[in-house]
Every structure is written in structure tokens, then in C-alpha cells.
Amino acid sequence: MEMASRQIVAFGGGGFSMESGNPLLDDYVLGLTRAERPRVCFLPSASGDADHDIVRFYRAFSAHRCEPSHISLFRREQGPSDLRRHLLSQDLIYVGGGSVVSLLGVWRAHGIDSILREA
């Protein structure tokens, strides 16, 4: 299968975090990966790794349609230990909404900003 080109899809609102009964936006971004079972990592950093956002993500991106994961930067005892390796292995990196100031600060502290530029 041909590898999808790298791209950024940005949207404000919608998707699993705002429209739990409407999978159209989530289906669209999954389809962009062109992978049969895309690896999808959720970064809930902007919401301070809010549990309700993580639960909604796993409900929307269930294991039967993709391989979901998330990275909690405010609770590093959870999730993958090698952030770079994990993020670079993903077909889709889904960044959740919230405070951009908080997001940028915690990303810089953990090197996520540099990893995402590389992805």
C-alpha cells in the first residue's frame, strides 16, 4: 500500500470531543491515513490530560477500527516511555483542544514540539 503524504489537518471543534454521535470528521481523518488499521495517538495536553477527553477518544477510536493510544504528559507514569519512537510510529496524531499556552509549555518541557516537527 502506498504511504500517505505528510499533512496537517487543523479544525476547531467537532469530532469526538464535541459530537459524540457524529463520526464523520473522525472517519474523514482516519481515511486520510490510507491505512487499513491506522495507529492513532491522542495528545490531550491542552486540556491538562483531562480524563473525560481521553475516554471520549477511546470510545470514538475503538480498537476494532484502529490502534488507539494516548500520551499523558501531566501523568508520565502512564503511556509509552519512548515518546519519540511512539509518535513517529503513528499514522495519525490527534491533538485535543484546550489551552494553547499550556499545550506549548508542556510540549516544550518534554520535547514533543521537536518530535512533531520531525513527524
Where on the chain are the PLM-derived regions?
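Hydrophobic N-terminal alpha-helices or hydrophobic patches in metabolic proteins across all domains
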Residues: 1-119
